Amino acid sequence: MRIPIGRLADALKMGVSTLRDSDEPVRVSVFVDRTASPDIVAAVRDALVPQTTSALVRVAALDSTAPEVKPDTDVALVLSCGSDLLEDAVRGIVVAGAPTVVLAESSVEVPFIEHDTPMLGLIASTDRTGLLESLARWILDRTDKATAFAANFGFMRTAAANRTVASCALTNMATGALVFIPGADYPVMTAAQLGMMLELASIYGKPLHIERAYEAAGVAAAGLALRGA
């Protein structure tokens, strides 16, 4: 079997790209209403501690003045249990162009959000774990910086990793179904799993150095050589 150097090179390029992705700038704006639950405030405060210098979390009080939303904001979080200011403030944040989610204890507190849209959502929960799991999925659905977000915020890593593994599994399943020559799918699947390995390393804040990436490619090449022997 011919060793697909091109496929392995593609996997390495994907890994280098993933390393760059993990260093992308991430900007999160958090607006805290005076009615916000202390438990929700504490959960978000503990969860949004950046692990790299590429992430920045901006925090501001929600009051009668118009919310200031920087143009580079990736997502905005509004912590509130309902107030007279909430609807107008949220509208202003969305109009500024930032995907916005309101975190509350009950949907009754935020009646103007009836269902999620690409730009606006509501997560209502009194359970810290459930709140953060839902928030992780909500953000991942609305950003193209999944690796950077997960590398910075630990509560997002499981959701991001699950998506990476599922995507690789679906790719390999489709490859296996479409390739009719025995063994011909092996190089493609190996390359996909190398890429997945590098992406998972970045998601968990432990990016592989390029020397280790070439090591992994060498192991894959040796496996292919033995298979073809």
What are these regions (language model features)?
Residues M1-A61:
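Extended, compositionally biased accessory segments flanking or bridging domains
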Residues A159-A229:
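Membrane-inserting effector segments that mediate pore formation, membrane fusion
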Residues R20-P25, E68-D74, V94-A96:
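Flexible, charged surface loops at secondary-structure boundaries
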Residues I40, T53-D63, G97-A148:
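Canonical P-loop GTPase G-domain recognition
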Residues V30-A36, V78-S83, L103-S107:
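Structural motif
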Residues T143-A160, T164:
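Active-site helix-to-loop segments that bind/position phosphate- or nucleotide-bearing substrates
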Residues R45-D74, S80-R91:
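A short, well-structured beta->alpha microelement
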